[in-house]
């Protein structure tokens, strides 16, 4: 039965296996990634991998937890700055940061995210959802006129997830027809136009 790492050396081994999982996934895809591929890239015996993971799916789970920590670690320190930005600046900052994270280390995180929807444990995404809702609520506190928007949590969820999917789709396109800067401006305009329109509608109803 796989065990949890206790000693620093064991933690280092598990970390190497998880990083190797990202590399193997980028090279071989989901179906063709095997525990042997992962172990070889990590520089450990397959038996050592099985000390901590029962199969490649458990490695994928650990990769997802790692990715969630990376996203949370990227966004959380930015919140005090993000909440003071206007809508377009906020969208641009988040999208550029997200792109930089995905393209780091030869794009291994990008390849993972392009597959993640197929096998990522849904419950493990909750820390990101909580963080983004916290960002949304704090943003509204700094921009109290937004309280008048109807169904704000639902629209925030749709726009955040839609933006993430759009960035991943763009970055995995071999020959995109627009620049990333244009994409960011377009998404920022879409969110800003929605907010402005809803605020005008709310004002007309008063």
Predicted regions, residues:
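N-terminal intrinsically disordered/low-complexity leader segments
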Residues: 1-12, 23, 199-206
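Short glycine/proline-centered loop/turn elements that form peptide/ligand docking sites
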Residues: 1-6, 23, 32-34, 42, ...
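Helix-turn-helix
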Residues: 12, 16, 24-58, 62
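Short hydrophobic clusters on alpha-helical segments that form packing/core surfaces
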Residues: 17, 21-25, 71, 98, ...
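Alpha-helical DNA-contacting segments of helix-turn-helix folds
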Residues: 60-67, 112, 128, 132
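Amphipathic alpha-helical packing segments from all-alpha helical-bundle domains
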Residues: 69-76, 89-96, 100-107, 120-145, ...
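Short linear capping/connector segments at secondary-structure termini
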Residues: 76-81, 111-120
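Hydrophobic/aromatic-rich alpha-helical bundle segments in the mid-to-C-terminal region
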Residues: 110-114, 122, 142-190, 201-206
